[in-house]
C-alpha cells in the first residue's frame, strides 16, 4: 500500500514537472520570406537586409535575371516558393499579371506611389525609376552634335559611333516605346539601322566603359550605370545627354515588385512590399543604386537631374506590356 502511494506521488510530481516544462501553446515557427530578385544583386540584398533588421522577418534572396525568374514563376505555378518578385524592369511583371499569378497590392501601398508607375489593376508597383540617356565621350563628339532624337541613330552617318545592348530589358522597353509612338515600321527601321551601323555590347556597364575608354563615341544606356561607374572611379571623361521634348530616347522605366498570389505568407509579403515603397525603403534602395525614388514627394540625393525636369515620352510602364513585340522584332532583324 505504501509502495503504491509512493509510486502515485512520484508519477504526479513527474507529470506536474512535465506540464510546467511544456508551454501551454507551441510558439509558431518564425516567418521567412523568399524574394526572387531580378534587380541588381546588391540592391535586392540591401533592401532585404534592411527589412529584416526592422521587422525580424528573414528574407531569403534568390538571384536571377528578371525574365528567367518570371518564367520560373510560371513554371512553378501554385507550388512556387517565392513570396515576392522584384524585377529590373516592368514587362516581366506585366506578363505574370496577365496570367493571373500576382496578388492585389494593398491599397495603402498603392497610395504612396504615382498611379502612372503602378499596374492599372494594382497587381505590381514601380519601386524606383530610371531614364534612358546617351552617354558620350566629349573627346570624340561634342554634345551639340548629338542627334535631336534617338531615332536618328539608325542613320548611316552614325556608323561605328553608337553602341547599344540588344539583350538589355531597358533597350527592349525602348523599342516597345518606339512601336507605341512611331509604329512598327519605324521601330523595325530603327533596329535594322542600329544592327547595320552600331556596335553591340554584352551588357550596359561594358558599353559604358567603352565610351569612357574612347572605344566608341556614344552608347544608349540607363542613367544609373554612369553614376555607378562614377562612384567606382571618381571623375569620368564621359558625360550624359538627356533627350527632350518627349522623345522616346528619354523613356522612363521602372524596377518593379509584386506579391505572388501563391505566397504562403501574404501578410508578411505585403509588409515587405510596403517597406520597399516606404520612404525608408526607398532611401535604402537609392543609396545603393542611382535611381529615382517613386514614393510621392521624395527626391534623389545622388545628384541626378531632377525627376521633374525629365521630358519623357507619354508612355507608361503599363503601356509597355510584356515587351514580346519588341523581342519578336529584334529576332526578325537578327539582333536577338
Predicted regions and their residues:
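Mature extracytoplasmic/periplasmic domains
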Residues: 255-314
Amino acid at each position: 500500500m505504501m509502495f503504491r502511494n509512493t509510486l502515485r506521488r512520484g508519477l504526479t510530481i513527474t507529470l506536474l514537472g512535465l506540464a510546467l516544462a511544456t508551454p501551454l501553446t507551441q510558439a509558431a515557427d518564425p516567418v521567412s520570406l523568399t524574394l526572387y530578385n531580378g534587380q541588381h544583386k546588391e540592391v535586392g540584398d540591401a533592401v532585404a537586409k534592411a527589412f529584416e533588421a526592422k521587422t525580424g522577418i528573414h528574407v531569403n534572396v534568390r538571384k536571377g535575371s528578371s525574365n528567367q525568374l518570371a518564367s520560373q514563376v510560371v513554371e512553378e505555378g501554385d507550388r512556387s516558393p517565392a513570396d515576392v518578385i522584384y524585377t529590373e524592369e516592368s514587362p516581366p511583371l506585366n506578363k505574370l499579371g496577365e496570367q493571373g499569378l500576382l496578388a492585389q497590392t494593398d491599397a495603402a501601398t498603392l497610395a504612396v506611389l504615382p498611379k502612372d508607375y503602378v499596374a492599372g489593376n494594382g497587381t505590381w508597383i514601380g519601386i524606383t525609376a530610371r531614364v534612358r540617356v546617351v552617354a558620350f565621350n566629349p573627346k570624340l563628339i561634342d554634345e551639340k552634335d548629338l542627334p535631336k532624337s534617338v531615332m536618328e541613330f539608325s542613320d548611316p552617318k552614325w556608323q561605328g559611333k553608337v553602341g547599344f545592348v540588344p539583350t538589355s530589358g531597358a533597350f527592349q522597353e525602348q523599342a516597345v516605346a518606339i512601336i507605341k509612338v512611331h509604329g512598327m515600321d519605324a521601330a523595325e527601321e530603327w533596329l535594322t539601322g542600329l544592327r547595320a551601323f552600331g556596335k553591340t555590347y554584352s551588357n550596359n556597364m561594358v558599353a559604358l566603359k567603352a565610351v569612357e575608354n574612347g572605344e566608341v563615341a556614344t552608347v544608349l544606356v540607363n542613367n544609373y550605370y554612369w553614376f555607378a561607374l562614377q562612384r567606382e572611379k571618381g571623375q569620368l571623361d564621359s558625360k550624359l545627354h538627356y533627350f527632350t521634348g518627349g522623345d522616346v530616347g528619354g523613356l522612363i522605366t521602372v524596377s518593379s515588385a509584386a506579391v505572388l498570389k501563391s505566397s504562403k505568407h501574404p501578410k508578411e509579403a505585403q509588409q515587405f512590399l510596403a517597406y520597399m515603397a516606404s520612404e525608408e525603403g526607398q532611401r535604402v534602395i537609392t543609396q545603393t543604386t542611382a535611381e529615382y525614388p517613386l514614393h510621392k514627394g521624395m527626391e534623389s540625393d545622388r545628384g541626378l537631374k531632377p525627376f521633374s525636369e525629365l521630358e519623357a515620352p507619354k508612355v507608361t510602364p503599363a503601356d509597355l506590356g510584356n515587351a514580346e513585340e519588341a523581342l519578336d522584332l529584334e529576332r526578325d532583324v537578327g539582333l536577338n
